[in-house]
Amino acid sequence: MNNSDIKALIAKIILFSLIGVAFWLLTPNAGLITYAILVLGAIIWLIYETAQKKNRHLIKHGILMGIFLMIFDFIVENIGFFAGLWTSPQSLYSVISVPIEIMALTLIGGTAWAIHLPQKFDKAYVIFESLIFGFFGALGEYLLILNSMMVYTNGWTSVHAFFGYIITWLILFWVWYKVIRKNS
């Protein structure tokens, strides 16, 4: 990992911490503003990444990753919903069980995430990044639960979510480096 990779990891920790503090400060009455904060954060991140000249050649690849993440998340969220593990009861509009705001977040945030990744696969980076997303993903879901935006059922817990996010991010890294970026 080089210095810019370390800075990117630190920037994500800071961004996700700020979002977490905003959720916590608004608890228990945050409601739909939680989704607005997440989507706005993803939009700002995407604007930042695409504004950098060095990243412009990655935009099409990034969009493919965003689409992949949106579809992957849609499938996983619906499987969990129909298995009775969780539900997201509040949304402007849901597609089956997935809030449209989460679909926007995964598309936009997934695109920004892919664009910022190191040029070459880096095992240490993958491990740290997966742990960051595991921790903040589980924490984010916990805060959504506190704000009545999500409900766990039938024994699903934040620990399950933590490992689910880690597995998801390992899959995303594999798709990015072995499929989408393989020939570029």
Predicted region positions:
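Aromatic-rich, lipid-facing transmembrane alpha helices and their immediate juxtamembrane interface loops
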Residues: 1-184
